[in-house]
Amino acid sequence: MITILFAVPSLWAEYESALPEALDEAGIDATLVTEADPADVDYIVYAPASPLQDFTPYTRAKAVLNLWAGVERIVGNQTLTQPLTRMVDPGLTEGMVEWVVGHTLRHHLGMDRHIVNPGHVWDPTCPPLARER
């Protein structure tokens, strides 16, 4: 049987019922635990908030499954020798696209003239159209 260590206690309540259901739907026979002997762990579900930072004892682990799309907080961890996967989800992608578009428009439209305006003075300057930039 596969043993999956959910190594993010602060997020367990959010995943406690959803992960077993998803494993069942995928036909994966696995035991999902929040504590385990490192020698028994096949996969680690991880997020940067996890107290688990030393992966050295997890010699049997086949992969670390990161709940976040970003991996910048873990890639420098010298104890991580297992393959690292990151979350890929349409909602994460959509949210990141919206965030990038929003900040790009903020920059190109010069919105900080209005947002960061301690004198509360109206600036009637029209930004150029995109094709004119």
Question: What residue ranges belong to the model's regions?
Answer:
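A generic alpha-helix propensity feature with a strong bias for hydrophobic helices
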Residues: W12, R60, P127-R131
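Phosphate-coordination loops involved in phosphoryl transfer and adenosine-cofactor binding
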Residues: M1, T81, R131-R133
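Glycine-rich NAD(P)-binding loop of Rossmann-like domains
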Residues: R113-R133
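Phosphate/diphosphate ligand-binding glycine-rich loop within oxidoreductases
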Residues: D42-P118
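N-terminal glycine-/charge-rich "phosphate-binding" loop or analogous flexible N-terminal tail
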Residues: M1-D42
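A short alpha-helix capping/helix-coil boundary motif
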Residues: L32, T79-T81, C126-P127
